[in-house]
Structure formats: C-alpha cells, structure tokens
C-alpha cells in the first residue's frame, strides 16, 4: 500500500471515529441500548488505529525537526552525530508504525469475530482414523481452554474401537473464527497403530470443517424444507434411559443435510441445537461457494478453506508436524498438546503478507 493510499484510509478512519464520538454524546443514541452498543463497539475497534495514526503524525513532525537539526549541526560533528542517531531511531519507529497501521487496514473477514462449530470426521484409515479424529478433538479442546474459550461437544458418533466417526464441537469466545478458520481441511497422521504387531506405519486421515455460527436472520430456513423426527436417546443405565424421545433427527431437503442431535437433556434443547448446527452448515456452503468464485479471480488465501484440501501431516516417527500450505515443520508433541499459537500465527502472517502483496499490485495497476 503506497503512502498516499495509507494516509487517505487513515484519515477516513479518523473521521469515522470522530463521528462516532459525536453520536455517543447524542441523548437519542444513549436511550437506545442496541444502537449504543453497536456504536460503542465500532468506536472501540477504531480507537487503537486512530491513536497509532496520531502517534505517526507526531513522529513525522519529530523527523522533520531532527532533519533540520542535522543540517544546522554540520559545523559541530558531535552534535551532528547525535542528531543523526536521533533521526535514525525516529525513522525506525516510523517504519514500524507504518507497518502496524498497514496491517490494521488490511481487509477483514466480517465473520472473524464469531464463535464457531468444528466438525471433525474420520476419513481414510478405518479404526485408526476414528482414533485420530478423537486426538484432533482433544487438541482443539486444549487450545481453546488455553485461550479461555468455551469448548463443548454438541454432537458425536462414537466408533466401536474407540475415537469418533464424527464429532461437532461448539467453540465460543472472542475472535474464534479468525484463528480456527485456518484449520479447515484434511489432517493426515502417520504412526504405528497400537493394534499393529509388525510395527508398520499406517497413514490415516480426518477432515476438519470450521463453520462460523450463523444468525437466524442471516440464514433463513423454511419450515416446509425440514423433515423432523424424534428418537430415544441412549445413555448409561437407569430407569429413564430410552423412555423419553429427546433426540432430534433433522433433515434439510434442499441441501440434503441431516443433523442428529442427542447431547441435550430435552427435546426442545436438542431441536434448537440441531437448528444451530444446520444454520452453520448452510452458511459454510455459502462461504465455500463464494470462496470458489473468488479463487477464480485471485489466489491470495493461505489454503482454500475447503475441507478436502490436505493441509497438514502429523508424523509420529519423526516427531514432526508439517503444514503443507506454509512448507514449515513444527514439533509434533507441542501441536498435539494444544499449543497451536505458532502454527496459526504463521498462517495469519502468511495471509497478511499475501494481502499486502495484492494491495501493492493493485496500487501499481
């Protein structure tokens, strides 16, 4: 992004911030809690950007003063040296701030702030793939707990030999989608299964879909498009087990999506949860379609976000996790223990780098 474009966008952000300040002082806005919350949230989002822009303006002024001092000190070598050092430090601070502001102005995914549903499905590899799906679920649970997110399994189909054929996990928290969206795709594991007597390495896979939570207004579902039936939920022994039909089997005819929900205690809760899952799945389909159209015009994403894309291999023998989008290796134990900060951070950095390159190319055009 060239300097003139950067300043223009920063001035626009500054004007928007000042306008929001005026709106917050308006009694009519103060009397409307919903509008007040919306305006206050947008003001909070812009405040760090505007503050950094003001810092940049101050540093630019100090740079001009330092340059003037360098010229005035040519007859005094010691003073000139001090002035040049001061100018060098100011220029360094200025460049760092410009970099920070440029990143802050990069296009944001409007869904980045949302909570998500993670759908993990066992792929190729039979029983070992089911065990691997369970390992991935625990990895994300540990990562979410570290960040203070609320991580809760809401639907699952257990496998006979352990692990899961599929599992849907609700992950609620701040900016969850902005991080976990890079986890969508095929996760491949290479290891010796516990049942392997010859010590041979097997390759298994599991797919991860990352679905941002959808608002009912955002994804409209017609009641005529649904087929809903109830079933008895299984569970540990007891007089009430299987006597009340609390499970919900929901089928969306236009998309062919089926959701079976048994985790909640009541039929109404399971129905609400099933509808929540269905909305997220339908939104994921919309996003996938939009991404496919966008990729035909440009290829600037870190990965496609498609659940069929092979994104990572976990090699137990070499204690190595390879992210194929980045071409970078990470320690296996670190990743599986839920320490995904380095991996996801590298994906975010690569995405920002590509976005900046695209903006630069647009400026040249």
UniProtKB/Swiss-Prot annotation:
Main location class: cytoplasm
Keyword Protein biosynthesis: yes
UniProt-listed InterPro entries: PCRF, Pep_chain_release_fac_I, Pep_chain_release_fac_I_sf, Prokaryotic/Mito_RF, RF-1
GO CC field: cytoplasm
Transmembrane domains' residue ranges: none
Compartment(s): Cytoplasm
One MF term in the entry's GO annotations: translation release factor activity, codon specific
Posttranslational mods: Methylated by PrmC. Methylation increases the termination efficiency of RF1.
Name of one Pfam family that matches: RF-1
Protein keywords: Cytoplasm, Methylation, Protein biosynthesis
Modified residues (N5-methylglutamine): 239
Function: Peptide chain release factor 1 directs the termination of translation in response to the peptide chain termination codons UAG and UAA.
Similarity annotation: Belongs to the prokaryotic/mitochondrial release factor family.
NCBIfam families, per database record: prfA, PRK00591.1
Protein's UniProt name: Peptide chain release factor 1
Organism: Prochlorococcus marinus (strain NATL1A)
């Amino acid at each position: 992004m060239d300097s003139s474009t950067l300043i223009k966008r920063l001035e626009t952000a500054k004007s928007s911030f000042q306008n929001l300040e005026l709106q917050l002082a308006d009694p009519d806005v103060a009397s409307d809690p919903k509008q007040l919350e919306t305006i206050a949230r947008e003001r909070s989002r812009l405040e760090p950007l505007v503050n950094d822009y003001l810092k940049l303006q101050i540093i630019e002024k100090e740079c001009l003063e330092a340059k003037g001092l360098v010229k005035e000190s040519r007859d005094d070598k010691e003073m000139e040296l001090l002035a040049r050092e001061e100018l060098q430090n100011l220029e360094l601070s200025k460049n760092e701030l410009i970099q920070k502001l440029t990143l802050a102005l990069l296009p944001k995914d409007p869904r980045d702030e949302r909570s998500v549903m993670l759908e993990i499905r066992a792929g190729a590899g039979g029983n070992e793939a089911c065990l691997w799906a369970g390992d991935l679920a625990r990895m994300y649970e540990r990562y979410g707990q570290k960040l203070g997110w609320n991580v809760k399994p809401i639907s699952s189909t257990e496998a006979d030999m352990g692990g899961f054929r599929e599992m849907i996990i609700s992950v609620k928290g701040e900016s969850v989608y902005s991080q976990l969206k890079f986890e969508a795709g095929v996760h491949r594991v290479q290891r010796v299964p516990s049942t392997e007597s010859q010590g041979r390495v097997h390759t298994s896979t599991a797919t991860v879909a990352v679905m941002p939570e959808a608002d009912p207004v955002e994804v409209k579902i017609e009641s005529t498009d649904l087929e809903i039936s109830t079933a008895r939920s299984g569970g540990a022994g007891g007089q009430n087990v299987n006597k009340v039909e609390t499970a919900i089997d929901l089928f969306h005819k236009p998309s062919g999506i089926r959701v079976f929900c048994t985790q909640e205690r009541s039929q109404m809760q399971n129905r609400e949860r099933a509808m929540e899952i269905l909305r997220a799945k339908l939104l994921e389909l919309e996003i996938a379609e939009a991404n496919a159209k966008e990729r035909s015009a440009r290829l600037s994403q870190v990965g496609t976000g498609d659940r069929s894309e092979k994104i990572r291999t976990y090699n137990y023998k070499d204690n190595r996790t390879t992210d194929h989008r980045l071409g970078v290796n990470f320690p296996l134990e670190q990743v599986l223990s839920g320490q995904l900060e380095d991996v996801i951070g590298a994906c975010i950095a690569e995405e920002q780098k590509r976005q900046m390159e695209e903006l630069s190319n647009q400026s040249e055009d």
